Curated annotation (Swiss-Prot):
Coiled coil: 142-170, 466-491
InterPro entries listed in its UniProt record: Fusion_F0_Paramyxovir
Record-level GO BP terms: fusion of virus membrane with host plasma membrane; symbiont entry into host cell
The protein's name: Fusion glycoprotein F0
UniProt PTM: The inactive precursor F0 is glycosylated and proteolytically cleaved into F1 and F2 to be functionally active. The cleavage is mediated by cellular proteases during the transport and maturation of the polypeptide.
Family stated for the protein in its record: Belongs to the paramyxoviruses fusion glycoprotein family.
Chief location: virion
Compartment annotation: Virion membrane; Host cell membrane
Span of the signal peptide: 1-31
Membrane topology: Single-pass type I membrane protein; Single-pass membrane protein
Extracellular topological domain residue ranges: 32-500
Annotated source species: Newcastle disease virus (strain Chicken/United States(TX)/GB/48)
Residues glycosylated per entry: 85, 191, 366, 447, 471
Keywords, in A-Z order: Cleavage on pair of basic residues, Coiled coil, Disulfide bond, Fusion of virus membrane with host cell membrane, Fusion of virus membrane with host membrane, Glycoprotein, Host cell membrane, Host membrane, Lipoprotein, Membrane, Palmitate, Signal, Transmembrane, Transmembrane helix, Viral envelope protein, Viral penetration into host cytoplasm, Virion, Virus entry into host cell
Length: 553
């Protein structure tokens, strides 16, 4: 399937390439280090190069279906060649008629042209409904009408050549290559043995090869016999038609050997029949190739999560499936606009989403910042292979080591177990036997525990349970509020009126004033009493001294 069309205005290709190239020049990208994340149940499964493309290059393949035999040997293979020619005409004439109907539908102007155009497409569609893709393909077929006419102008010279690959350039607006898989067979095999082979052997050889090619043609054009706009021809179908000669056209269009295998796997190289001539048995196919821009410093990193053990049950990490990193910036990558191959991503546009600080910190190696969801069921596969080793949750399954024999136990609090050839050479998990060849070095963190605060609820059933608990708490709170209201209702409202409160405040202030005055008066009286006591004591002492003096005299 192709990339999902955007609902917004598409970004122009040149602007997108410029922006992407600016991003790629920021600084070299470092892929996410999966070693500290593995023990937390987050496994980096691989990286892919990110490319941006647009389908802008086209070229034509002229398939020569009928080979030319040496003049002195034509009589030997006349019978199988005539039968093959008749079968070809019967097989491909509906295809040629459908092509001509669509191309001739543009001869009328105005609204009638549009009706004839759609009618020509629907005429070959079984359900009578023309999809947008079919209309687009038919429009491309009409645009190739002039090129098809130029090819037909050269059809005699193309049919007469004995070359298996012949570049056609006279009067054509785009590169065209004439190829003949059957001619290749005749040139490589038939001419070498014709001198030593009798007529019967020649007829048998040609007949067998032609029958095989007819089978391939039927397979290739099965869905397109009635409508060339129904389906595109895949790169595999084009190779079946042209054989190894297909590489010549791709090389001429600028597809390098380093890109060829990846582009073939992407399905971006497609073809549409644009002409069929039954007189010379020539089949014209317009090939569309993508124009690819490589973003050297951008890679997509794929993440998988493993169900880990926590004190709150089994849970899996909440991280994106695909992230991309440029310099120190890590963002989630939307691959819905991309086509994936084993090593590359081909995208019509680059769409990323920012991540929360917690997820960013988690993917940077701080596993204590990772959040987990209790959404994994008991039937989830509790193990994953990585580089010849195994990361397994040995609390969910029995990790049985066959060589050396023993049971691998997972310590309390550990999220998962990292098992390599150092601890077990042959491992049995759920009846599956794995021979381990990898090794977790010292940089891999182990014995990571998941805290309760890192586990949150995201599953529908779990959320319903938690909502039930919340509802119970709310009900209890409402009951307490009702009790409070009943107690408040018993309070005399008159005592809490505004006038009563003002009276209480005034009386309180007066009481405070009297209290302060009483305190001051008490302090004054105590001070005066102490002064009188000192005076009396002084008078007493004087009198005593005078009496002593009188006695001595």
């Amino acid at each position: 399937m192709g990339p999902r069309p955007s609902t917004k205005n598409p970004t122009p290709m040149m602007l997108t390439v410029r922006v992407a190239l600016v991003l790629s020049c920021i600084c070299p990208a470092n892929s996410i280090d999966g070693r500290p994340l593995a023990a937390a149940g987050i496994v980096v499964t691989g990286d892919k190069a990110v490319n941006i493309y647009t389908s802008s290059q086209t070229g034509s393949i002229i398939v020569k279906l009928l080979p030319n035999l040496p003049k002195d040997k034509e009589a030997c293979a006349k019978a199988p060649l005539d039968a093959y020619n008749r079968t070809l005409t019967t097989l491909l004439t509906p295809l040629g008629d459908s092509i001509r109907r669509i191309q001739e539908s543009v001869t009328t102007s105005g609204g009638r042209r549009q009706k004839r155009f759609i009618g020509a497409i629907i005429g070959g569609v079984a359900l009578g409904v023309a999809t947008a893709a079919q209309i687009t393909a038919a429009a491309a077929l009409i645009q190739a009408k002039q090129n098809a006419a130029n090819i037909l102008r050269l059809k005699e010279s193309i049919a007469a050549t004995n070359e298996a690959v012949h570049e056609v350039t006279d009067g054509l607006s785009q590169l065209a290559v004439a190829v003949g898989k059957m001619q290749q067979f005749v040139n490589d095999q038939f001419n070498k043995t014709a001198q030593e082979s009798g007529c019967i052997r020649i007829a048998q050889q040609v007949g067998v090869e032609l029958n095989l090619y007819l089978t391939e043609l039927t397979t290739v054009f099965g869905p397109q016999i009635t409508s060339p706009a129904l389906n595109k021809l895949t790169i595999q179908a084009l190779y079946n038609l042209a054989g190894g000669n297909m590489d010549y056209l791709l090389t001429k269009l600028g597809v390098g050997n380093n890109q060829l295998s990846s582009l073939i796997g992407s399905g971006l190289i497609t073809g549409n029949p644009i002409l069929y001539d039954s007189q010379t048995q020539l089949l014209g196919i317009q090939v569309t190739l993508p124009s690819v821009g490589n973003l050297n410093n951008m890679r997509a990193t794929y993440l998988e999560t493993l169900s880990v053990s926590t004190t709150r049950g089994f849970a899996s990490a909440l991280v994106p499936k695909v992230v991309t990193q440029v310099g120190s910036v890590i963002e989630e990558l939307d691959t819905s606009y991309c086509i994936e191959t084993d090593l590359d991503l081909y995208c019509t546009r680059i769409v990323t989403f920012p991540m929360s600080p917690g997820i960013y910190s988690c993917l940077s190696g701080n596993t204590s910042a990772c959040m987990y969801s209790k959404t994994e069921g008991a039937l989830t596969t509790p193990y994953m292979t990585i580089k010849g080793s195994v990361i397994a949750n040995c609390k969910m399954t029995t990790c049985r080591c066959v060589n050396p024999p023993g049971i691998i136990s997972q310590n309390y609090g550990e999220a998962v177990s990292l098992i390599d050839k150092q601890s077990c050479n042959v491992l049995s998990l759920d009846g599956i036997t794995l021979r381990l060849s990898g090794e977790f070095d010292a940089t891999y963190q182990k014995n990571i525990s998941i805290q309760d605060s890192q586990v949150i609820i995201t599953g529908n059933l779990d959320i319903s349970t938690e909502l039930g608990n919340v509802n119970n708490s709310i009900s209890n709170a409402l009951n307490k509020l009702e009790e409070s209201n009943s107690k408040l209702d018993k309070v005399n409202v008159k005592l809490t009126s505004t006038s009563a409160l003002i009276t209480y405040i005034v009386l309180t202030i007066i009481s405070l004033v009297f209290g302060i005055l009483s305190l001051v008066l008490a302090c004054y009286l105590m001070y005066k009493q102490k002064a009188q006591q000192k005076t009396l004591l002084w008078l007493g002492n004087n009198t005593l001294d005078q009496m002593r003096a009188t006695t001595k005299m």
